[in-house]
A protein has these predicted regions:
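Cell-envelope/extracellular polymer assembly enzymes that use nucleotide-activated donors
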Residues: 2-3, 33, 177
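Acidic helix N-cap motif at the loop->helix transition within catalytic regions
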Residues: 13-17, 41-51, 94
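Short, acidic, metal-binding catalytic loop of nucleotide-sugar glycosyltransferases
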Residues: 20-31
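A conserved acidic beta->alpha catalytic loop
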Residues: 21, 37-46, 62-64, 89
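Acidic donor-binding/catalytic loop of UDP-sugar-dependent glycosyltransferases
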Residues: 44, 87-102
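Glycine-rich, basic loop-to-helix element that forms the pyrophosphate-binding segment
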Residues: 60-77, 134, 151, 177
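Short aromatic/hydrophobic "clamp" motif used to bind/position activated sugar donors
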Residues: 82
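Catalytic donor/gating beta->alpha subdomain of glycosyltransferases that bind UDP-sugars
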Residues: 103-135, 169-174, 178-207
Length: 207
């Protein structure tokens, strides 16, 4: 069994799209547990999620930040593998299956998926962001071929739950730190380009 963990703060605008995306994932029925952690949310995110009986919602009205929410969720989740994704990013249908396949290698403790930027044009912030993530993905792929990728992006990555280490609540790059803590335990970070998360581009260079 696998948990798909979605950390969300006031994401009511994307709940329907994200849940349609979750339901489109090509993974055996009953083997994927979709869990949202919505700590601190004050909009209709929790209310809207109530319409999806297959979803587990973890909610605390107190807002402690994303890192605190992830720490709390990992204290509750019990599946051997946990796949992390953001509420505003959409996964390709094969993403979870491809990520899970990487864990067939017992030396792999973390899997980094690929981040793609949707609808990037030839100019402006969208184009620049798209080029950056293509470059970042290529570096991860090359590192993986040599031995182990370095770091993972929060839009799509996965870990063996038993290797998770509680993060300091002032951690800024939780995805990177989490993956590197697993690498420090002697495990490899695999890169899986067949699993990708699609995200809308930033509106401007400031974002």
């Amino acid at each position: 069994e696998v948990t798909l963990l979605i950390a969300a703060y006031n994401e009511q605008e994307v709940v329907a799209e994200k849940m349609a995306n979750c339901r489109a994932l090509d993974y055996p029925a009953g083997k994927l547990r979709v869990t949202w952690i919505t700590d601190g949310s004050t909009d209709r995110t929790v209310e809207l999620l109530a319409a999806y009986p297959e979803v587990t919602v973890l909610h605390d009205p107190r807002r402690g930040g994303k890192t605190a929410a992830l720490n709390r969720a990992l204290g509750i989740v019990r599946t051997p593998l946990v796949v992390f994704t953001d509420a505003n990013t959409m996964l390709n249908p094969e993403a979870v299956a491809q990520v899970v396949r990487c864990f067939e290698d017992p030396a792999v403790g973390c899997v980094a998926g690929e981040k793609r930027v949707a609808g990037t044009g030839n100019t402006g912030a969208a184009a620049t962001e798209g080029v950056y993530w293509k470059y970042e993905s290529k570096l991860k792929e090359l590192d993986h071929r040599l031995y182990s990728a370095v770091g993972a992006a929060g839009e799509l990555f996965a870990v063996r739950r038993e290797l998770w280490q509680t993060l300091r609540e002032d951690t800024l790059l939780d995805d990177f730190v989490c993956s590197m803590l697993i690498a420090a335990q002697g495990y490899r970070i695999a890169y899986c380009k067949e699993a990708y998360a699609l995200e809308s581009p930033s509106a401007d260079m400031g974002e």
